Amino acid sequence: MPPKKQSSSGGNKPSGSGSSSGRSSSGSSCRCSCRCRCSIGGWLKFFAILFALVAPIAYVLEQRLESFYVFDTEHLHDLSKRAISAHGNDTKAIVKYIVDELNDRNGVAPYVNNDEEWVFNNAGGAMGAMYIIHASITEYLIIFGTAIGTEGHTGRHTADDYFHILTGTQTAYVPGEYEPEVYPPGSVHHLVRGTVKQYRMPESCFALEYARGWIPPMLFFGYADTLSSTLDFPTLWRTSVITGREMISNLLKGKF
């Protein structure tokens, strides 16, 4: 008796199963791709709406920026020169002279921090210490310097920065130049908003640093070295507490 032929349907099962699996995998891939596109589209829509809401507010505030300032650049320059004239190379006495006069100045005194809280500051590869005299949304005034010298990147900021050199000398460099900019005591190094330089304090140097513009975005520059290099979180915490305290305190006083 001849053997029974095997049914061809049995041989086709693996092929059908593979085809079904391929279609299933293809369908899953399409659904995943669709979800990704929807997710990206959702985020793009969110940022577009956020930008549409924030941009007009930022524009209006930018036009009114000058009205938020309580410090005057010419007065700070004059004050720095008078302090230097009165105390020479005595940095501590110079700082006291400056803070005392600010405390006697109408419109400024309520916003001055009289607690001389010095903290290390690492930013742009440079290291020094600072005493925050004032911090708000649109201005900050600090004493910054070091007794042993430092060098680094100025950062590219959303505010104009004025370095009033009190003691020592600061030098700066701009690409394309062959000679350094030199700032001795009594001079002002003005870093224009949005520009950048290399700077150096070869030896002991202290400055009254005044920034006017949008201050919060500058904080990222101040935090970057700690987060990526020094990992000095106690100093970062103390700096954040002092800065936040002063900003909030000034906001409560109506100083933006």
Curated annotation (Swiss-Prot):
GO terms for biological process: ergosterol biosynthetic process. Pathway: Steroid metabolism; ergosterol biosynthesis; ergosterol from zymosterol: step 2/5. It is found in: Endoplasmic reticulum membrane. GO terms for molecular function: isomerase activity. Its main location: endoplasmic reticulum. PANTHER family: SIGMA 1-TYPE OPIOID RECEPTOR-RELATED, SIGMA NON-OPIOID INTRACELLULAR RECEPTOR 1. This is C-8 sterol isomerase. It comes from Neurospora crassa (strain ATCC 24698 / 74-OR23-1A / CBS 708.71 / DSM 1257 / FGSC 987).
